[in-house]
Regions:
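Bacterial lipoprotein signal-peptidase II cleavage site
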Residues: 1-9
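Extracytoplasmic small-molecule ligand-binding "clamshell" domains
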Residues: 11-87
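Acidic, polar ligand-binding/catalytic clefts
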Residues: 52, 61-124
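Alpha-to-beta junction loops
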Residues: 60-61, 77-86, 128-129, 156, ...
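A ligand-binding cleft/hinge motif common to bilobed small-molecule-binding domains
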Residues: 71, 88-96, 141-144, 170-188
Length: 188
């Protein structure tokens, strides 16, 4: 999780938030199992439960603002959200503009392909059309290693997987945990 302010238990009484009485969390709720929406439009997932526990401990009402990943990061930087929880990987660039908690998950990048794909490893990605989620480390790695011309950035991982299913990209590079969720939901 990244936040605009850090507070220890002893500093809780002095914690200032964007809106008094609320803890505003920005997220991109299309990143299972960390954050997603149910069929009824409710937010759920590991990050949602963690944010609720933080809000409860601080005696605040949790407000979740769902937006594109890049916008979720910017919301904290612009003072529109108190924290972002959206599977955010710690990078030097991000540490220059926001504070991070201790890591509570380790994200490794995975490649999602169709069953009949000729892509068997990262070595096979050269010259392929790679789908990613805009602004993520998967996007950054693929753009750096395979060139912007080979990377298509989508607003969220779900859209990237839909484009793979429709044949518009050859693969999707995304964190391992959501990759498993997307594969389970999209056989073939």
């Amino acid at each position: 999780a990244a936040s605009s302010e850090a507070a220890s238990e002893t500093e809780t009484a002095e914690l200032s938030t964007v809106e008094p009485g609320k803890l505003i969390m920005s997220t991109n709720a299309a990143f299972p199992p960390y954050e997603m929406t149910t069929d009824s439009g409710e937010f759920e997932g590991i990050d949602i439960e963690t944010a609720q526990a933080i809000a409860d401990k601080l005696g605040l009402e949790l407000q979740i603002d769902d937006m594109d990943f890049d916008a979720a990061l910017l919301a904290v930087q612009q003072g529109k959200a108190d924290m972002v929880m959206a599977g955010v990987t710690v990078t030097d660039e991000r540490q220059n503009v926001m504070d991070f908690t201790d890591s509570y998950a380790t994200g490794i990048q995975s490649i999602i392909v169709k069953e009949d794909s000729d892509i068997a490893s990262v070595d096979d990605l050269a010259g392929k059309k790679i789908g990613t989620q805009r602004g993520t480390t998967g996007y950054l790695y693929c753009s750096d290693d395979f060139g912007d011309e080979n990377v298509v950035a989508y607003d969220n991982g779900l859209t990237a997987v839909q484009m793979l299913n429709n044949g518009q990209v050859d693969c999707v590079v995304i964190d391992n945990a959501p990759a498993k969720e997307f594969i389970a939901a999209n056989p073939g």
